Amino acid sequence: MVKANYIRAGRLVRIIRGPRQDRVGVIVDIVDANRVLVENPSDVKMWRHVQSLKNVEPLRLCVPISRNCSSKVLKEAMATAKTLEKYANTKSAIRIAAKKAFAESTDFERYQLRVAKRSRAYWSRKIFDENDKKNPVSWHKVALKKLQKNAKKVDSTPAAKKRIEKARAARKAKPTAAKEKSKK
């Protein structure tokens, strides 16, 4: 599927590289085919500046503004459209926030996270296994259940019962034969 997030005034963009990396702004004006004017009045570091199109990722969200509007108008339009709140709920924003939090975390916090992940995996596996015993859903349990069902059908014939009895008798006879050899 082709991305249709075209560059236009009012389009929300994320800065890819540089000192403003992963910050969000709005295209206020298009300078030329390679550069745009970007601003975010609610972010102190995102004052109105020129950005290369190679350095911005257009997002699907838009703000209804005219080209080269004032900061006041842009701030009001962003507040009424609630674009920053909508962006904060997107998967990419959540991923970036998690990445930033992990990078800023201390050694001990990363250790705690590893321990918590291990614990969560252990308990979820334990609960899954308990439920799998009651009502099999994993492929190996289902396959085992099918094999046992087919074995019951085969074992119910008189010839199969005879073979099973013969095998049981042979198994019982083996230990006694071993004892006799050890006595001699």
From Swiss-Prot:
Q: Where is this region: Disordered?
A: 149-184
CDD domains hit by this protein: KOW_RPL14
User: Which Pfam families does the entry link to?
Assistant: KOW, Ribosomal_L14e
BP GO annotations: ribosomal large subunit biogenesis; translation
> What Gene3D superfamilies does the database record attribute to this sequence?
2.30.30.30
What GO CC terms are in its UniProt record?
cytosolic large ribosomal subunit
UniProt KW keywords: Ribonucleoprotein, Ribosomal protein
Q: Where is the composition biased (Basic residues)?
A: 160-174
A GO term, aspect molecular function:
structural constituent of ribosome
- Name the protein family: Belongs to the eukaryotic ribosomal protein eL14 family.
* The protein's name: Large ribosomal subunit protein eL14
- What is the organism of origin for this protein? Trypanosoma congolense
